[in-house]
Amino acid sequence: MIPLTHYLILSGVLFAIGLMGVIVRRDIIVIFMCLEMMLSAANLSLVAFSRAQGTMGLPNYDGQALSIFILTIAAAEVAIGLALIVSLYRARRTASTQDLNTLKD
């Protein structure tokens, strides 16, 4: 059985990579993908904690159920976010965050 710390370290590394992508990158689609990576890292830690909390040898499935619910909500978020990004690209012919300031005009 893999220890809980390995899952949490992996989750932390994935979250840090996603956070760095959000901070450093300028392309909206890449930022969106990094946000989804951060959400997946949070789901991984949630499932890992749920697995480690099992009582009397039986696994606790609360974390898995919540993770599936979060993934369902994230799918709707992806659909709406990509629709907004495509709409922005059609209007401005760019997907860079530096050009978003022109939306104020």
From Swiss-Prot:
It is a multi-pass membrane protein. It is found in: Cell inner membrane. Keywords: Cell inner membrane, Cell membrane, Membrane, NAD, Quinone, Translocase, Transmembrane, Transmembrane helix, Transport, Ubiquinone. It comes from the Bacteria. It catalyses: a quinone + NADH + 5 H(+)(in) = a quinol + NAD(+) + 4 H(+)(out). The chain crosses the membrane at residues 4-24, 28-48, 66-86. Disulfide bonds: none annotated. The keyword Signal does not apply. GO terms for molecular function: NADH:ubiquinone reductase (non-electrogenic) activity; quinone binding. Its EC number is 7.1.1.-. One of its GO terms (cellular component) is plasma membrane. Gene3D superfamilies: 1.10.287.3510. It is an enzyme of class 7 (translocase). NDH-1 is composed of 14 different subunits. Subunits NuoA, H, J, K, L, M, N constitute the membrane sector of the complex. NDH-1 shuttles electrons from NADH, via FMN and iron-sulfur (Fe-S) centers, to quinones in the respiratory chain. The immediate electron acceptor for the enzyme in this species is believed to be ubiquinone. Couples the redox reaction to proton translocation (for every two electrons transferred, four hydrogen ions are translocated across the cytoplasmic membrane), and thus conserves the redox energy in a proton gradient. PANTHER family: NADH DEHYDROGENASE SUBUNIT 4L-RELATED, NADH-UBIQUINONE OXIDOREDUCTASE SUBUNIT ND4L. Belongs to the complex I subunit 4L family. This is NADH-quinone oxidoreductase subunit K. The lineage of its organism: Bacteria, Pseudomonadati, Verrucomicrobiota, Verrucomicrobiia, Verrucomicrobiales. The gene is nuoK.
